[in-house]
Amino acid sequence: MVMELHNHTPFSIYFITSILFIFFVFFKLVQRSDSKTSSTCKLPPGPRTLPLIGNIHQIVGSLPVHYYLKNLADKYGPLMHLKLGEVSNIIVTSPEMAQEIMKTHDLNFSDRPDFVLSRIVSYNGSGIVFSQHGDYWRQLRKICTVELLTAKRVQSFRSIREEEVAELVKKIAATASEEGGSIFNLTQSIYSMTFGIAARAAFGKKSRYQQVFISNMHKQLMLLGGFSVADLYPSSRVFQMMGATGKLEKVHRVTDRVLQDIIDEHKNRNRSSEEREAVEDLVDVLLKFQKESEFRLTDDNIKAVIQDIFIGGGETSSSVVEWGMSELIRNPRVMEEAQAEVRRVYDSKGYVDETELHQLIYLKSIIKETMRLHPPVPLLVPRVSRERCQINGYEIPSKTRIIINAWAIGRNPKYWGETESFKPERFLNSSIDFRGTDFEFIPFGAGRRICPGITFAIPNIELPLAQLLYHFDWKLPNKMKNEELDMTESNGITLRRQNDLCLIPITRLP
């Protein structure tokens, strides 16, 4: 150590001293700022902060972020203040506090933070998910609920869903027919199937651009996962140019070109009125608002909405199907009951379609229980306060980010007995639903910013699960026991398995 110190030049010693002095001054300013804030504003409780990083060190590790946030909330309460970098965040982990945010004060918390990475992929916040609350958002949401994602429109995609799921069943059957019982990667095939449904619903027939688009959407989601340094230090120009920004822009340029080609193809296609009515896809619907409406969408607006639909209808649906099958493998009693129900309903037909899905009451309970334990988006898309307000006796300053931990709320022991156990029966004689009125169960959010694509997502979950249970029995490879199945979660925007779900399918003989 002495040798190293002597080897420093006067310039380097001066430089180090200057850095230490700047750090000391900054530390004092942070202390003064924090003490001033705490003396004038009664924030919710939270752990002590460190200079520069705040509480970042307490949510970084080998586990997904929602675990750390729940553990901290167990100590500091369901309305908790965290300083992440230079940004104040309020973490919500109880149904009561979620109701305050998404119902009582819903309008005040209806804006989105201006995240650097989401700004890139959402075309400056022009999609339904990341746009700010206002006239544009209201018009866009109206298009989604009245035109784009109505029950009638979603039902018109029934043949697409049935064809894509039939292709999946065919692939599995081919594997099951191989000698010795071959292993099938269910994760990859489910992901491909749900995105295939979303692609055909959005673009019409199978597009030559489809695989490139799906691949790039997956890359975008990976780069969007977690906290961006630029969003933790929004005042720093240096951080704005660092991190995943360059990588994301590169991937997004490819996605943008593909979407523009698809839009141009739709514009140039001449259709008769009869053909348009028969096969109208989501791009067709959105393009009508470039011609026949006072509220005109640009090409970039359309691209942003299509991406939102892909994430809601493809990524989240595949996550629920994947976790549903994982839980069924780990709980053979539930698997047997679910298979018995599906086979009882469909055996007279000999095949599964959507006409009788409403009769699968136990399967619907399985889906709800899956979303309780594994919500597709564990930390709901953050909100930001528009004005200063008071919640539960605490002050929430304006421009404060709000993070709602839906994963933790689904494990709240006050509302759920045996929180870690997979028990679909808890929903059988219960009116609790996922449409935003029961705040102990909010996998799709609630209030003004609830996911508008629920009607699009649910059939993409019910039909595949029913088919997988009807046609096949399932077992783990390498003589693994059911309880040995790894259930580790990956870190990211959506809740996925860390390791792919690989099973041995056994074709069921009628």
Curated annotation (Swiss-Prot):
Keywords: Heme, Iron, Metal-binding, Monooxygenase, Oxidoreductase. The keyword Coiled coil does not apply. Pfam families: p450. Its cofactor is heme. Transmembrane segments: none annotated. SUPFAM superfamilies: Cytochrome P450 (SSF48264). Heme binds at residue 451. Belongs to the cytochrome P450 family. This is Cytochrome P450 71D10. It comes from Glycine max (Soybean).
